[in-house]
């Protein structure tokens, strides 16, 4: 019992015992009472009978049997009922004791109450489990959020696109309508020529033929088309001259002369028209010239439609590789203006202050289109479709500065800090997702650019973006 | 006999030119054709023609134009010239605007772009017969 005193001083957690080869206890230290609640004498009657029937103890009994034969065992654990009925986990270290002859005389053991340690370990394990579960939940939530975010970005794009489509429908239906009508006009003119060709070739007088050929040569193809106001001015002027010259049906003759771009040549034309049935000659010329006039109209309509389609194609163009490319910022911005043309023309004056020497910049052009789309669309909305939209592009050598200024309602001071927050919107439900400006900021950051704005309520807002050239 | 006129209002010259020629082709020299590029000019034209004792019978107006929209324009026309037949011709159907024009301008018909000459002819002819029936 070398360390008896030492061990007894550790009474709160340890007790010490020894038993002979028959299992009779020779000694149990008094701290057994502190730990298990049994008096020393009571404990000496045997601790094994207080063991619970746990799986752990079944193994422990095997270890105890081996230990009792003098075979040195590693530290082992078992569970015991205390006197009060609670369960304690005891860790045992036993060692055999031999006499000089080498005979086993007793087994000495140190019992360590590790109940609290086990409980702590259990708690830690449980907490670890919980943490692991929470981490998994968080990961799932993040994945969900990412998914939601990309859906929102998508729906923001779709909303912007939806806005555009309504306008684009108008922008495309207009030239198609014009083309359709022009084709109809050409067909009718040709039908009319064919119906009258015999008369024209055989029945007209020499004078009428001369008038026909002279006027045919006079048609002013190079004259620019008149706007409606000018047309009305010339109509009055020409009609008055025709009236004074004593013509009948001056409304019809006037219309033909305007149609043939002869609106400035009335004085020369009047003597030529002093023939029998001038309307027939003019009508014939009209029908021939109609093919050219309507073809020109179709050409203009096609150009208009192509411009819209091109802009639309660029807008929805998705570059899967997502590599930066050298792009022309002016074209990039003007394309967005084309797409918003139908909204702009309702009452917005666009001022374009572009420096002449803007270099191509290395960027993601499709993403920048989204930036301009958002900012221009917001500006139009802020101005309630009436006001001045000023777009400035400055060459600052290493960087290009773009500013988009409106004369709209402005952004109240108290929400200045909020406008880039996701889901913040001042628009009515359904009009905006509240991530437009967040998207703008992200795209600018991706370009290592800079975004600032100035705003005064009632005066307007200016967004200024600088982008590196390289 | 008093001259009769059909007036078209659209901010696109390609429409005014092709539509005007088409109307002339359909209706011949019996009617004058006048055009205007916006609502303000449209009203000016109607007033001018009226002053010249020309009877404006039909007005065909676009909806989406700079300045005043088609429905507001037709309502204004209706207030000053209730007898004129009002037709809207536009590439973008705005239901609210159409209903507004039906309710407040007695809109005769709505044609969407692109239109067919048959539709245009039918709409204008039914409009004209309305006037004749009223005397």
Report each predicted region and the residues it spans:
Chain B
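Receiver (REC) domain active-site loop signature in two-component systems and cognate sites
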Residues: 65
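Helix N-cap/capping motif at the beta->alpha junctions
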Residues: 20, 35-48, 70
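Short amphipathic alpha-helix used as the core "switch/output" element in two-component signaling
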Residues: 44, 71-83
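Two-component/phosphorelay signaling modules centered on CheY-like receiver
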Residues: 8, 13-38
């Amino acid at each position: 019992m070398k360390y008896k005193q030492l061990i007894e001083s550790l009474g709160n957690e340890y007790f010490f015992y020894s038993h002979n080869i028959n299992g009779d206890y020779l000694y149990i230290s008094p701290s057994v009472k502190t730990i298990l609640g049994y008096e020393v004498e009571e404990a000496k009657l045997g601790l094994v009978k207080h063991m619970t029937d746990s799986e752990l103890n079944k193994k422990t009994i095997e270890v105890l049997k081996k230990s009792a034969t003098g075979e040195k065992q590693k530290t082992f654990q078992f569970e015991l009922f205390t006197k009060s009925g609670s369960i304690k986990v005891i860790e045992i270290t036993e060692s055999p004791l031999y006499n000089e002859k080498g005979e086993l005389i007793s087994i000495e053991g140190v019992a360590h109450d590790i109940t609290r340690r086990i409980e702590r370990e259990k708690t830690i394990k449980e907490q670890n489990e919980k943490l692991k579960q929470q981490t998994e939940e968080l990961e799932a939530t993040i994945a969900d959020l990412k998914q939601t975010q990309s859906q929102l970005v998508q729906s923001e794009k779709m909303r912007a696109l939806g806005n555009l489509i309504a306008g684009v429908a108008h922008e495309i239906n207009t030239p198609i309508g014009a083309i359709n009508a022009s084709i109809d006009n050409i067909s009718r003119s040709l039908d009319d020529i064919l119906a009258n060709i015999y008369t024209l070739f055989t029945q007209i007088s020499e004078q009428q033929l001369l008038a026909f050929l002279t006027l045919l040569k006079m048609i002013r193809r190079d004259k620019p088309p008149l706007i409606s106001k000018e047309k009305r001015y010339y109509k009055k002027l020409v009609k008055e001259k025709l009236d004074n010259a004593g013509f009948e049906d001056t409304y019809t003759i006037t219309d033909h002369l305007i149609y043939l771009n002869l609106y400035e040549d009335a004085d020369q034309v009047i003597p030529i028209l002093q023939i029998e049935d001038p309307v027939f000659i003019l009508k014939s010329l009209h029908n021939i010239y109609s093919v050219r006039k309507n073809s020109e109209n179709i050409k203009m309509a096609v150009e208009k439609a192509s411009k819209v389609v091109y802009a639309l194609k660029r807008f929805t163009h998705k570059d899967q590789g997502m590599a930066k490319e050298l792009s022309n910022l002016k074209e990039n911005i003007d394309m967005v203006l084309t797409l918003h043309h139908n909204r702009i023309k309702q009452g917005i004056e666009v001022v374009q202050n572009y420096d002449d020497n803007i270099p191509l910049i290395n960027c993601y052009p499709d993403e920048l289109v989204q930036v301009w789309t958002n900012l221009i669309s917001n500006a139009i909305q802020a101005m309630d479709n009436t006001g001045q939209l000023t777009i400035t592009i400055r060459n600052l050598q290493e960087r290009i500065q773009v500013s988009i200024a409106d004369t709209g309602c402005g952004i109240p001071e108290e929400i200045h800090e909020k406008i880039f927050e996701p889901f913040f919107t001042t628009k009515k439900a359904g009009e905006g997702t509240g991530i437009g400006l967040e998207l703008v900021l992200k795209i600018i950051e991706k370009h290592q650019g800079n975004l600032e704005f100035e705003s005064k309520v009632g005066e307007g807002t200016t967004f200024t973006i600088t982008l590196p050239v390289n | 006999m008093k001259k009769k006129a059909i007036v078209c209002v659209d901010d696109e010259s390609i429409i005014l030119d092709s539509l005007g020629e088409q109307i002339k082709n359909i209706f011949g020299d019996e009617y004058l054709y006048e055009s205007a590029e916006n609502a303000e000019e449209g009203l000016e034209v109607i007033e001018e023609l009226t002053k010249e004792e020309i009877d404006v019978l039909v007005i065909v107006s676009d909806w989406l134009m700079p300045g005043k929209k088609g429905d507001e324009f037709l309502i204004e026309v209706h207030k000053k010239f209730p007898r004129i037949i009002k037709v809207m011709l536009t590439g973008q159907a705005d239901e609210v605007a159409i209903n507004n024009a039906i309710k407040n301008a007695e809109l005769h018909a709505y044609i969407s772009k692109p239109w067919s000459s048959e539709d245009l002819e039918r709409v204008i002819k039914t409009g004209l017969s309305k006037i004749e029936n009223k005397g």
